[in-house]
Amino acid sequence: MGRATSARNWRFITPVGELAFKEALAKGVVIFGLQRVPSVARLKEYGHIVVASGYRPSLHLAALPQQASVDCCRLISWGLGMPCYPLASYLNLTLTPSNPILHTSRLYRLFKDYRLGKVYKHLPLFYEDWDDETTRLLFKCDAEVQALCQHLSEFDLSGIRSLKEHYGQVEVAAFSAKIRSIASFKGLKTPGLVTTGGYLPDFSSRYFSADFAFGLKLILQVGNLAQVALPTCQMIMTWYESFHSNTRKCPVRAMGLTRGPIWWLSTVNSVGLKN
């Protein structure tokens, strides 16, 4: 690891980092990210103990510049003790239909009727109470992302698998049952805050703060650049923006991520749409 890091500055960031770190890339910084997390992590004792479960058999990684991917894979394999394979381009991370549509579609299903002052008497478990309505919504989002990938036919996006393929279920009921049965998902709660009479959505949860602004929004912006409509994804994003307008709490606006073009999406090259 020492030899790999001696000649370069290395940073490990999330799959949208190529957009926000253009200046760093110009200075020779290597940016890399994982397509999916190695495992599910749960906090047991704050600041002391985290329990990890459901480890994947292998990981996939992309880097900028692309030629650094192999070295980055070696670094991750060494650090985590598991195989890691390079992806063809960083877009294989940015457009992967994981949490950016999995979490956001579920949150829309659970809180689509939310309004200021509304209190929920009960919040279902996030995964164990997964229902077919959520799956149908998720399938629409998944199909839209796949259509976007097919439109970008000049790029090798073979690393982006649909959620149906990823979970091995193509029918709504079977997919819902699969999500409910995953052992590492057991007991995971819907992000909520206890209040008088029940619960409120916890907008500070990473399910909200990360997966909308730095996940779903980026997919929509790539679609915007490619002139490919993603109506279901946009509906969910518009819902989130419509009631969550405080810039201090809403990264979508706080980071300049609006419905229109944003400063680091001014060119096609800025999202890696050029080999």
Where do the PLM segments sit?
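Secondary-structure boundary elements
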Residues: 22-23, 67, 78-83, 147-155, ...
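NAD(P)-dependent Rossmann-like dehydrogenase/reductase catalytic/cofactor-binding core
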Residues: 116-121, 128, 135-275
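Substrate/ligand-engaging "lid" and interaction regions
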Residues: 38-141, 261, 266-274
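Broad structural signal for hydrophobic residues in well-ordered alpha-helices, predominantly aliphatic
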Residues: 16, 20-21, 76-77, 222
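Short secondary-structure capping/junction motifs at helix and strand boundaries
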Residues: 26-32, 83-87, 155, 229-231
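Rossmann-like NAD(P)(H) cofactor-binding subdomain of soluble oxidoreductases
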Residues: 1-49
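Conserved beta-strand termini and adjacent loop/short-helix elements that scaffold enzyme active sites
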Residues: 34-36, 87, 160
